């Protein structure tokens, strides 16, 4: 299976460069793997560079989870992170993802200085 980089995923969802979007579609057509890091970068790019709102990003992540040609690394972890992200708009998707990665690995609590993140089950505020 091939693997897709962040810019490939961004082109698939934004379609802001139709030529690149078509090439990205063709690249993933037979199946492509998307790492957790690529997904976290995609959420950041969509928020900071494209100015998308929280729920728009959540909907895109949901769409990627259901995309017929994409296999997301640890989709169960991503789904749980997405659930936290939807419930707590002040917490970034990458923070939610870090917590769920730690949970799956059996390494809780997740120590953090982030007030909002520490409100989630499994996270512990250090100060």
Spans of model-derived segments:
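Acidic, PIN/NYN-like endoribonuclease modules and their adjacent C-terminal/linker elements
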Residues: 1, 99-127
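Alpha-helix N-cap and coil->helix boundary residues
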Residues: 4, 19, 34-37, 52-59, ...
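Active-site neighborhoods of divalent-metal-dependent phosphate/nucleic-acid chemistry enzymes
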Residues: 69-111
């Amino acid at each position: 299976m091939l693997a897709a980089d962040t810019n490939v995923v961004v082109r698939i969802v934004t379609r802001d460069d139709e030529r690149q979007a078509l090439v990205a579609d063709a690249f993933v057509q037979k199946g492509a793997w998307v790492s957790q890091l690529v997904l976290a970068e995609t959420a950041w790019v969509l928020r900071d560079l494209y100015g998308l709102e929280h729920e728009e990003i959540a909907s895109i992540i949901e769409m990627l989870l259901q995309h017929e040609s994409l296999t997301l690394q640890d989709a169960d972890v991503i789904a749980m992170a997405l659930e936290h992200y939807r419930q707590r708009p002040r917490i970034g998707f990458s923070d939610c993802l870090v917590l769920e990665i730690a949970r799956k690995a059996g390494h809780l609590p997740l120590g953090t200085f982030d007030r909002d993140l520490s409100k989630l089950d499994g996270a512990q505020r250090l100060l």
